[in-house]
Amino acid sequence: SELRSEKRKLRMIVEGDVFLRTKFKNESKFVNGVEIVTTDADAYYLVTTPDEHYEQIRTMLIEGKHVLCESPIASSGKECKELFELAKKQKCVLMEGIKTAYSTAYSRLLLLAKSGEIGKIVSVDATCTSMRDDLDSLENKWNSISAWGPTALLPIFQLLGINYTDKKIISHYIDDDKMFDGFTKIDFIYPDSVASIKVAKTAKSEGELIITGTKGYIYVPAPWWKTDYFEIRYEDPTENKRYFYKLDGEGIRYEIVAFNRSIESGKNYSYIDSKISIAISEIIEACKSNNVIEI
């Protein structure tokens, strides 16, 4: 492509939420070879509302543009799968944006959890809540499962896989149409383990991540999704281990690097498998079904 042959800067347009847009622009300054522009772009970073994603991404891919999209990529698994297939056909990069996946501490704790350091994993429990948003008007606002679900689901799907045997979704809605969940809890059952997420925009809880094993557990304090520190704890506290890692730009910086490298090389440098992206979109879809238990 022109980009690879000339080694010129990747020209990106950033669209959507002002707060995240500014954050992304600031972090892009630390990445060589990326330039934020307003016209004539090679790629887009999308932080628009989830219901807009499918049409926007589809249009951009058809135009031959690369897309980094804040998760969820689509509101259904079918749409998400279709977009990845279209990206492949168009020889474009489509990457899901969950910045936590690119933080050094998070990558390290995944490796340690998978290595058997805490024995066999029997449970993964993630909580993400925030009450920043003014919810007087719900128009163009991300509901709890869209805003926090992908982040909370990430360690579950990366550690236990996507082949759960059952799930139970419990939500509290704050609108008459039952489209905006103020609080959602999802329990997953796997053949030999369990998992749960709690996400909320109208409730507050400790935003921690706990990975339970047969020998010990990994504890990541709040806010775990911006972690630079975690502990492995055992029955004997003298054996406990602490891990500290520098967190540069909440993971956004490394996310941009991975996106740029994927485009330059034609290889996939995303830390999130497309199967996981599809599984996340399936959960977003399931939260709109009649099987949700309402509280």
Residue spans for each PLM region:
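N-terminal Rossmann-like dinucleotide-binding module
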Residues: 1-28, 293
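NAD(P)-dinucleotide binding in Rossmann-like oxidoreductases
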Residues: 175-177, 181, 190-257, 261, ...
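C-terminal helix-rich "cap/oligomerization" subdomain common to oxidoreductases
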Residues: 22-25, 29-32, 43-46, 258-295
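Conserved acidic residues
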Residues: 11, 42, 122
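Rossmann-like dinucleotide-binding domain that binds NAD(P)(H)
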Residues: 135-205, 210, 275-278
